[in-house]
Amino acid sequence: LLTEVETYVLSIIPSGPLKAEIAQKLEDVFAGKNTDLEALMEWLKTRPILSPLTKGILGFVFTLTVPSERGLQRRRFVQNALNGNGDPNNMDRAVKLYKKLKREITFHGAKEVALSYSTGALASCMGLIYNRMGTVTTEVAFGLVCATCEQIADSQHRSHRQMATITNPLIRHENRMVLASTTAKAMEQMAGSSEQAAEAMEVANQARQMVQAMRTIGTHPNSSAGLRDNLLENLQAYQKRMGVQMQRFK
């Protein structure tokens, strides 16, 4: 699930060194390595380039994921970004959506319901939850986040959304890069102390650097297909020699 969230969130961030940095922050947060929400929010608030809405979405994701003290202040820059441009229509729709989301229990169910709403209504609904005016499960909140990112990526891509399958090249591209990073991580964990460990680390390292480079300079969405295939091929070859089954990484 977190891989999916990372994919969607990163698909709305313009390529550049900042995108690579945000990818790292998300990975750390999801892995439980970064637990200082105050510092994270302060860092996010001062980032250049990002639109207020993108900052709002990231702030919402960090707040959902990082455990924090109950009384921690909500941040104004996130609240302002998630107020649906102050449009009362967005607020009305957000309340309707919130009532539907309360009935959902799965990430995909929530995402599906949310996709039929406008970005403004989705942002307002996140605002409701962020301001503790309503509560949903984390999984449902992530569904809402991903639906919002898909709407934004779609409008960036100007493509027509199809509900059932992700056809947006930006999201597919980001997904391949996230998968490549995840696979690299898995290779390093498997490497252990065997004599092939150095080789596994090398392959994983190359993959990391490529993903980092692709995020930093930005590439055509089609170029990432090869990256993942190469990585999986290397992984398969390495696992064959190690006598390990490929099952886990399909």
UniProtKB/Swiss-Prot annotation:
A Gene Ontology molecular function term of the record: structural constituent of virion
Topology in the lipid bilayer: Multi-pass membrane protein
Region annotation (RNP-binding) ranges: 163-250
Localization of this protein: Virion membrane; Host nucleus
Sorted UniProt keywords: Host nucleus, Membrane, RNA-binding, Viral matrix protein, Virion
Coiled coil segments of this chain: none
Record's GO cellular component terms: host cell nucleus; membrane; virion membrane
Location of the motif Nuclear localization signal: 99-103
This protein's record includes keyword RNA-binding: yes
Region of interest (Membrane-binding), ranges: 1-162
Remarks, miscellaneous: Most abundant protein in virion. When expressed alone can form virus-like particles in transfected cells.
Assembly mode: Homodimer and homomultimer. Interacts with NEP. Binds ribonucleocapsid by both interacting with genomic RNA and NP protein. May interact with HA and NA. Cannot bind NP without genomic RNA.
Family according to the record: Belongs to the influenza viruses Matrix protein M1 family.
Functional summary from the UniProt entry: Plays critical roles in virus replication, from virus entry and uncoating to assembly and budding of the virus particle. M1 binding to ribonucleocapsids (RNPs) in nucleus seems to inhibit viral transcription. Interaction of viral NEP with M1-RNP is thought to promote nuclear export of the complex, which is targeted to the virion assembly site at the apical plasma membrane in polarized epithelial cells. Interactions with NA and HA may bring M1, a non-raft-associated protein, into lipid rafts. Forms a continuous shell on the inner side of the lipid bilayer in virion, where it binds the RNP. Determines the virion's shape: spherical or filamentous. Clinical isolates of influenza are characterized by the presence of significant proportion of filamentous virions, whereas after multiple passage on eggs or cell culture, virions have only spherical morphology. Filamentous virions are thought to be important to infect neighboring cells, and spherical virions more suited to spread through aerosol between hosts organisms.
Name listed for the protein in its UniProt record: Matrix protein 1
Annotated source species: Influenza A virus (strain A/Teal/China/2978.1/2002 H5N1 genotype W)
